[in-house]
């Protein structure tokens, strides 16, 4: 799952329309590479400017809002090469452009890759990307039980 945690000052992403538009553009990044939409989770977290310090100084709303984004990738690991990383950050930048950059807001983000084996949906181990089970999850847009999706602690097996 991609998990986006967007930290922003009050007055930014306040209305449902602006949140929905950004979340839709973020979701397109991942559906374009074959992930089901339900994998994509976006949290909007308003943070008072008095609670954000940049360089040891409180970051006030004026003159420019500061947006901090933490992105966690779990479903797919990126190839460890500059071209892949640049393509990925380019896709992220394109999604952010109309919602953040074009408004002149300051924005910083980073992407973390989390261990896939520590990830579950409703107790199910997500199927491997592009497997037949994965295609069912994409088609149904929800977790669907399949053989091997459950780990039995008692038996030490699937």
For the regions a language model picked out, list residue spans one by one.
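A domain-level signal for the structural core that forms small-molecule/cofactor-binding pockets
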Residues: 1-158
